[in-house]
């Protein structure tokens, strides 16, 4: 075999090896594609890879740590259930909170109408006791409201990432789909154009979900739900 043919064969083997590496590590490849898109200022591609894409100033980068893949059941059905339960708790507590406020307001009227010192003292004690009870109910209601808001936001975020991984614009029954979610973290060291060193943490996820009613499997792709600077 001639020297020219040997060079050609070597080049082909390098290309095949590169493609094989990407195929065997699609999670790593998605980070590489993201940085390539940044390099080209290709915002459209960045937006198809990351849920919330950010521009990163870099001259060079290196994936310094690629964590183990964690596999967990799809969380969205349980998150949706929790959201509904907290919503009901919040709604059920509206009545007791308003009742406590009404009783307190009546006690304050009694205090305003009290004329004798003993009557005023008794009315004031009643107001103080009812105020404490109302404050307790109000603080509980605020906590229930916070818990519900947090659960609602978390479920909405999970829904967004699930649909993004599936590559769909919308999936009407996404909250009912079962299946599994693969996740991992990657640390990327970046040298900026000014020569500074920074480290970014990439969250990676892949959703493989199943519609139990239609007996249909929906296979997702590795995506980047979050990127943050850690140093």
What do these predicted ranges mean?
Residues 1-20:
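Sec-dependent bacterial lipoprotein signal peptides
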Residues 23-25:
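Bacterial signal peptide processing site
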Residues 27-31:
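Nuclease catalytic cores
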Residues 42-57:
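Short, well-ordered alpha-helical segments enriched in acidic and aromatic residues
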Residues 54-72:
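Short, charge-rich amphipathic alpha-helical segments embedded
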Residues 74-91:
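Alpha-helical linker/edge segments of TPR/alpha-solenoid repeat scaffolds
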Residues 88-231:
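Exposed beta-sheet edge and beta->alpha loop/turn motif
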């Amino acid at each position: 075999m001639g020297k020219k043919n040997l060079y050609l064969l070597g080049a082909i083997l390098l290309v095949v090896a590169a493609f094989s590496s990407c195929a065997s590590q699609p999670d790593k490849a998605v980070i590489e594609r993201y940085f390539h898109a940044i390099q080209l200022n290709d915002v459209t591609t960045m937006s198809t890879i990351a849920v919330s894409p950010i521009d990163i100033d870099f001259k060079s980068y290196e994936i310094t740590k690629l964590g183990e893949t964690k596999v967990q059941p799809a969380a969205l059905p349980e998150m949706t259930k929790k959201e509904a339960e907290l919503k009901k708790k919040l709604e059920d507590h509206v009545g007791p909170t308003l009742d406590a406020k009404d009783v307190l307001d009546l006690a304050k009227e009694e205090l305003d109408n009290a004329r004798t010192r003993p009557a005023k003292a008794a009315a004031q004690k009643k107001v103080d006791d009812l105020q404490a009870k109302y404050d307790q109910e109000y603080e509980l209601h605020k906590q229930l409201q916070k818990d519900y808001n947090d659960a609602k936001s978390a479920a909405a975020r999970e829904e967004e990432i699930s649909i993004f991984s599936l590559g769909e614009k919308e999936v009407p029954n996404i909250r009912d789909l079962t299946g599994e979610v693969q996740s991992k973290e990657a640390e990327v060291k970046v040298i900026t154009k000014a020569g500074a060193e920074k480290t970014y943490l990439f969250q990676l996820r892949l959703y493989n979900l199943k519609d139990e009613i239609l007996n249909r499997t929906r296979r997702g792709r590795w995506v980047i739900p979050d990127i943050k600077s850690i140093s």
